[in-house]
């Protein structure tokens, strides 16, 4: 058997019969041989490696996304390198440079924080520069660019639907709890505001409540505002919604009889609290699946891949609402 044939088997070429492939793999297994991926990458001009970035791996949403991405990429024969960048622009830029230095085939960035503030171009310039070296895929964020692709939850429509449902149940003072002004958070706020306006309700600044996404911190901050009056809560994260439930418990407010609460992301928190939380499922699994499918298509030379895919959300109704 020639060296070229063995090389084709090791590198995953389809131009080898199954019988020959099995013979080579049997010898590799018997000898305990491990291919040098760096040498193989130089020969194939591909490391079969995807870089994945997120701001915080401890976040449940991020962890779920990473798990789904890694599993799906593995099925296509790709390995993954993970970088946790934090939220500062300098740290993000440094992680992008680090991953690109590993000769990754593509870069996946999870979370709205990578979309910048939507106003200043310099916030996302490093991503556009990175896309000149490798395809960039954003999950739940949006940047326009020739070699940049995005999969987004339809946060605007989900927020509009939640707010409208609360209004139909007679709610008039809907507190919007948020922790950032990322692309996703802005889409949710715009959906909330549009639903209020369409129903003829005023959009009140005192009902937009900004806090950290930390349960006890958010609860205590809400308690500190003595004149805060609301009959329902729509939170952009499940953790913030749980904070609202804890606020209600301290104040002796019954849920959902006196106060309706809706969270976001349908995380394990939504079924770990009492009462169980109505939450919007942003379908991160579907977003990741779409991202992987599109990445593979782009890397295979497909030029007709959509630069933006919108994934509809689902409201999972539980015990904190009566709609």
Model-flagged regions — what are they?
Residues 1-48:
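N-terminal helix-turn-helix DNA-binding module of bacterial transcription factors
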Residues 73-84, 176, 193-215:
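Short beta-strand elements in bilobed, periplasmic/extracellular small-molecule ligand-binding domains
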């Amino acid at each position: 058997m020639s060296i070229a044939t063995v090389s084709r088997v090791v590198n995953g070429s389809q131009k080898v019969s199954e019988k020959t492939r099995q013979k080579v793999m049997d010898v590799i297994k018997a000898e305990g041989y491990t291919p040098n991926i760096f040498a193989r990458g130089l020969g194939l001009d591909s490391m079969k490696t995807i870089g994945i970035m997120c701001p915080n791996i401890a976040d449940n949403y991020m962890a779920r996304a990473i798990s789904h991405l890694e599993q799906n990429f593995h099925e296509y024969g790709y390995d993954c390198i993970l970088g946790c960048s934090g939220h500062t622009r300098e740290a993000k830029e440094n992680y992008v440079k680090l991953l690109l230095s590993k000769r990754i085939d593509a870069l996946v960035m999870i979370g709205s924080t990578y979309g910048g503030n939507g106003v200043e171009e310099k916030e996302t310039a490093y991503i556009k520069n990175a896309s000149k070296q490798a395809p960039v895929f954003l999950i739940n964020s949006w940047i326009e660019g020739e070699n940049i692709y995005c999969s987004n939850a339809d946060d605007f429509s989900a927020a509009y639907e939640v707010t409208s449902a609360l209004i139909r149940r007679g709610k008039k003072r809907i507190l919007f709890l948020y922790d950032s002004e990322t692309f996703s958070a802005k889409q949710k706020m715009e959906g909330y505001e549009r639903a209020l306006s369409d129903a003829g309700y005023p959009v009140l600044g005192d009902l937009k409540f900004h806090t950290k996404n930390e349960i006890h911190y958010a609860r205590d901050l809400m308690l500190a505002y003595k004149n805060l009056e609301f009959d329902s809560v729509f939170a952009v994260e499940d953790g913030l919604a749980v904070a609202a439930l804890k606020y209600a418990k301290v104040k002796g407010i019954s849920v959902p009889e006196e106060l309706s609460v809706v969270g976001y992301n349908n995380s394990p928190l939504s079924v770990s609290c009492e009462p169980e939380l109505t939450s919007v499922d942003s379908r991160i699994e579907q977003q990741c699946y779409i991202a992987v499918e599109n990445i593979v298509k782009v890397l295979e030379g497909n030029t007709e891949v959509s630069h933006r895919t919108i994934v509809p959300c689902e409201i999972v109704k539980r015990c904190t609402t009566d709609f």
